[in-house]
Amino acid sequence: MRRSPPEISGYRGDRLKGMYEICGEETAARILKSGKNEIMEAIKFEKVNFSYGGEEKDSFALRDVSFSVEEGEFVAVLGHNGSGKSTLARLVDGLLSPSDGKISVLGLDAAEGKNTFEIRKNVGIVFQNPDNQTVASIVEDDIAFGPENIGIPREEIGRRISFALDAVGMSEFRHSTPSRLSGGQKQRIAIAGVLALKPKIMILDESTAMLDPRGRKEVTDVVLKLNREEKITVLLITHFPEEAMLADRAIVMNRGEIVMQGKPADILCREDELETFNLTLPRPVQICRDLRKRGLPIEDVLTPEALGEELFCALEARRKAVSPSEFASSENGKAGLPAEEIPLSENRQRNSSAEGSHFSKTAETDVLSTEAEERERKRDESVGQIDCRNLSYIYNAGSPFASQALNGVELTIEAGEFFGIIGHTGSGKSTFVQHLNALIKLPTAEKKYKPKKLKKGEAPPPLVKLTVDGYDLTDKKTDFRELRSKVGMVFQYPEYQLFAETVFADVAFGLKNFSKEEPKEEDVKKAVRAALETVGLDYEEMKNRSPFELSGGQKRRVAIAGVIVTKPEILVLDEPAAGLDPLGKREIMQLLHKIHKEWCKTVIIVSHDMDEISENCSRAAVFSGGRVIASAPPSELFLSPDRLTALGLDVPFTAKVTEFLAGRGIKILSDFTCRDFVEKVSEYAGIAGGEAHA
């Protein structure tokens, strides 16, 4: 008679239990006794420590780390920024050597030099910043670099290039120049370069952070397929809960130590432990708990379909249990509250007045004023405003590598808005914002510009209009140096904007560079102090430190301080929260709202995070194919999830739940912010209000 399988924990235990059922007691017992061969360890750390320099215990990036990953296992690594995740990844690949302890990769001792080539041949790693691993000037050459170095035959390399490009949706860019691609496109190429190696172990270090939702899904689908079908071992470092849920096991790191391991669904619902380790509950779980506090009996779930099902059952049960007067009509989604009594937030009220206003008011021309005075007067009336008409741009124009990035952009951003820009990878978002402070200049603004002579019968090109903060960017007479002091730009990976020896010198650089006269040292100190304190950094503690010694989050704050120190009227941020842990994202968005209130009239963020857009922006523009195809409040944009999905975009989590419920006949009318969603569901159910934390 067959006995019950023994108690074994973890991924190895799950697989051995399955083998016990298939092979029987005798074979399973032999496997358990041997502890090897049948299920090999792809990665094994034994009491590993690592320090980037100091000998003190606090300086260690990894401390006494022991864990193993079985061949074919999919493991997600979670943790706040600076917890040691990236260090761990680099130790696996042999890019770093441990201070002490032992690391084995595919049964090979990583400390032995003779094993280095074999390990690196079988371990592929994709970094967060694709610029750090781009080596060639043509995409296909970049992807071929790895296979060439491990001796793959030419014909096979060609097939692998095609496979990898197709897997990441970049086949049409095979002969393009990587430096001319968008950040998200570069990231796809970096992932393709590793896929072409067909490694036994694949490590992705926040490598989907810069991708649009469709790109993230395409990459994770490929990785999941390779894991399931080819048994490739995957180590996925991520901040996205939906990615972590794909894994067999999740590891949580804090201050260089592994502090939790288990099933992702279990790990992501442990509120007390997550807060202890500077992490936050995923947004779906927080919504569940807020609704449960209101009296709806729902379980913690992590997907919109699961939450929709939970809500449908809970609302139906409540509808049957209470009188009709207590329960809202499914047609209006409100519990007896007229629409006019539901207040809009300050942002949304401002947004309502801005929507539909495409052109700024134009004052009557003062014929007595000089041309310069007229420009200055108009600028004063348009401070913080952006008006764009017929804007187009081609990279590598006139060459075989020509690529149309913008194609007739039409957009007005009103002064005072907190504005969002969304769009799939390569849609023209970054190219557009680089026009706003003339990093990319319009041809008519170049000093050597001469109008093209038209041939007989040839139509003139469309008139381009681009005014930013009152400056005419089509006019070569515009003071572009002054413009750049008024339009601050924070790029993707803002920490790479740092260059000076000290934090003080870095933050003060723009202030000194843009001033027409040498500013007084006391004024510079005062301005730098104010900028650093605004971004949450202590002036006395930071001023003499090297910016390159700071943590990732501190570097990002110093970079933002260096931009706002000139007190720009417009602040533009390209993916400001990309690569940050959930707590870091929340803090950076709170910081931007503080800057919007105290420093800058208009704030513009480019983002792939639809929840970030819905929670923070008064209005947003959707870019596709180099054009703006929609501009509206997020609450209106996300009413058409199918259209956005077709563009490679996502919608907020709450919009997905709302759509699911609508399909079941329950209409919840909210602005898709988590707080408002909780309120509207509570109103629908006739539940007394409480505090929503989401």
Which residues does each predicted region cover?
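Catalytic Walker B motif of ABC-type/P-loop ATPase nucleotide-binding domains
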Residues: M202-D205, L571-D574
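The feature captures the beta-strand-to-loop junction immediately N-terminal to the Walker
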Residues: L78-H80, I422-H424
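Conserved ABC ATPase signature
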Residues: T177-L181, Q185, S546-L550, Q554
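Helix-to-loop junction immediately C-terminal to a conserved catalytic motif
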Residues: D93, N437
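Conserved catalytic motifs of ABC-family nucleotide-binding domains
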Residues: K198, K567
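Conserved ABC transporter NBD signature motif
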Residues: G101-A111, I119, A445-D475, L483, ...
